[in-house]
Amino acid sequence: MDNREQLRRITELTEQIAGLPKGYLSKKTIGGKVYYYHQWSENGVKQSRYLHDSEIAPLADKIEKRKELQAQLRMLKSQKSRRNEATGMKCTFMHKRTPVAELELDDVTGFIQKIGSVYAPEHLPIGIPVRNEIADRAAFNDWWRDRSIPASRSGVREALESLGVADTKMLLVRCYGLSLSDQYWICPEGAELRWEDINFFQNDFSEDIGDVLFGERKKKDALNFSSPDSTSDGNLKKRWKIIDGKRCLIKGGSNPFRQQPFNEVIASGIMERLGIPHVSYTVIWSKDAPYSVCEDFVTENTELIPAWRLLQAKKQKNSTSRYRHLLECCELLGIGNITPFLDRMLVLDYIIANEDRHFNNFGALRNAETLEWLGMAPIYDSGSSLGYDKMPGQMRSEKDVVCKPFKNHHAEQLKLVTDFDWIDFDRLSDVDELISGVLFCEEAADYIDEGRIHAITESVQRRIGHLQELAMTQTPRQLDTTEDDVREEVAADYAPKMEL
């Protein structure tokens, strides 16, 4: 097989594999009945979905087919050939204006094949070790993969087919890896590109990718891939737009209630009342569906480092809790005031019953050129809360409420709070009006009825009351224990779930 045929076959196999489900089937017995579910990992995050009986056999066949194709692809890649010369793209990994390392990317998969000279190891993403002047390729690929759109996002597979791209990592390559969250990018060999001319903070960007991700018909002309939508994470439908000169993120909600956009506004109102630094949200409507809108809080001089990357600053001991490990990592990196920030975040998440505060949903800000830490970022992304996927009865019982990032249950996370004195409970006296004002609107009635609104209001008021009792009776103390720690960093799965 010559190089051209080999490349054609590799591309074909890669596209076929991308269209098949990952992971494996598992089962568990509840009340004597066996339930099957699909389990897989996405960007290092474990995901799972319960299956109807009719789904089990077809899904098992597809997973087995994926394994067969992966074996063929591995065999093809292992053959001695000049494939790397045919498909490798050499580039310089940049941090704003600073050359950091030489890379070679696979033209088909977007993976990092080789890492050459490292010029500025201090500018590498946190958690990528350098040994004997060589950067760890596996760790670099993990970071690069996390930068791409997750394959689990709603509508992404259809979007890839429409774009003619086999893997979301190839979208990264086509936009030079540029983002509106940080200042990293890649400069292809021989390209005379300057950060000032191509970054999305100071230059306009195409809406083509966002249009396709939102299911809008692909235009007849050639697509412009220069878009920050290629480097946005998360499973919900989202896109970037320039509105009145500001970079704004537009994000949807999940069926059946489409509640997340409204929850962002409610959470913003609660944080405003409590004096918690936060990102402000509003709701807009498009094609009879609600979307939240927020302005980018990162600028051309700063960047967001998610807590997940902060945790990579040092190895976690088995006897150390996730909470304690984060504190130690922040101390090692020189990030101050982490404890007061976590106090406020955990209290907020208890009030709104947030279920998805994973380690990529909060982080720290730093100067991209000097690497000076500026403190923790304002709190953002609080939509998967307020019983967003639950019925009113479930909201009132709260028996199904789980949480992240440190403990599995909010009651245990509250034990990590060191100080309640900053909470002005009088400022929360009108929370019921806040919730009603956001949810009682004509458009929202198609998704959220009056009974649901009352259940949300009652649940929030009950949690505020319990928090007030706790603040008066409990002496806050940090618990350095791994009991009830979150073991898997599982992002919210918005796929329909089978009722148990």
Model-derived features: where do they sit?
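Phosphate/dinucleotide-binding and metal-coordinating scaffold of catalytic cores
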Residues: 74-347, 351-353, 364-500
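A positively charged, amphipathic N-terminal helix/segment that binds anionic biomolecules
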Residues: 1-81
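Canonical protein kinase catalytic loop motif
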Residues: 358, 363
